[in-house]
Amino acid sequence: MYKKILIASLALIAGLASCKKDDPTPSPNPPSGLTIDGVASTLEFYQLDTAHLSVAGVAKDAAAKAVWAVNGAKAAEGATFDFTTAHPGKYEVTLTVDGKSAKHTYTVAPRFSEGAFLLNEGNFGNETGSLTYIHPSKKLVIDQAYYRVNGTKLGNVCQDLAFGNDQIYIISQNGPKNGGEGLLTIARSNSLEKVKVYNDETLAQQWPTHIAVLRDQIYLRTDRNGIYRGTADGGFVSIPGTSKAKKLRMAQIGERLFALTSDSKVLMIQGTQVVRELDLSPAKPSGIAVSHDGTLWVSTTSPNAILKVDPTPDNFVALDTHVLDKSISSGWSATSAFFAHGDKLYFTGQSSVIYCHDFATSKTSQIIDVKTIDGVGTSANVYYNSLGVDPATGELYYAAFEDYGTYNKKNVTMVLKADGTKLLLKEKVNSFPAGFYFIPNAASRTGANR
């Protein structure tokens, strides 16, 4: 399995290793002669990185009989040892040769504190959902990230996730099928280490598709009975007046949750009640997101437009509307028709062409047709929840595949600058994309699922 790990292995050779000032001095000091080659001092690296270690200071035949142990447990024999782990923590690596020992302590840091996740539905018939981790500045992509950390699989047809309480909440539509664990998976957001898996057959029958987390409350939008509220321990109860909630991402501001409906409304939900409704008729809502100034962006078709909406209960109205000359339809997508960075809103109309509408200047421009990017071509034939935009950096994310018969063999995932310049491109790391999600970090981010 590890041959397929798409990571940049950390070569821990003495001349290149960087020491942390607050690291303790290794103790005890190794006896004269025997050393662990490939280290300079106690080092910090990340989950799934690899430290390539070897025996030094003894004869070749003696080195071949070396025994390596990690935290006191035998891990390998021989002159070399590749140390890797999926879990953060401190690890003492001990080398023993002919009764002599040398030791080093490693601090393994959480891998997933920044960057983005691509959630994948997986094939309904024979797969489960999965997470692909992306860090464009490090040119790093790790497919099957949750599985690599936990050794278990997400539920069948994962369609949405949310961040909250330093955790990541992943909802699957069909729960524990095809070897997947469950309906709702909760993991530590910075390490992906499993916290809890929740299953509820009754709730699963409602086909949950989208999730939002407000403090300890979990909101689930379902196909069959609108929006439910509960906790990680269960107790999910349907919220009256939400039965027409659309199969699209929701947005949150403070204690209020916002959802779109099939009868052209924006619902404002607080607690277990719909406290306000904004009627957009005859327009049809196609996406919603929190703006950088704390208001709401809402897109519609018939007409194609972008609205800025006041999210306060006392003035729940559209403040401004820009009509577009391009389609901003969400089609069959379950994410949103658009994604925003500042006053710039990016959309595709379910195509391979990315457009940008600048709300400050009222101008719409074409950024790029991703099919024209070297290495893409027909691998971007099918738009399937393909677009994402990092709300902090403005970088564009795009994942697509050639056709439904070869989705797992001919697909592409990429990151672009805001002008369409390619930053990163990987093949075969998506499987029916469910959308991109950007990890909350020191840069303040707002809104559900961002």
PLM ranges: what are they?
Residues 46-59:
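A short beta-strand segment in extracellular, disulfide-stabilized domains
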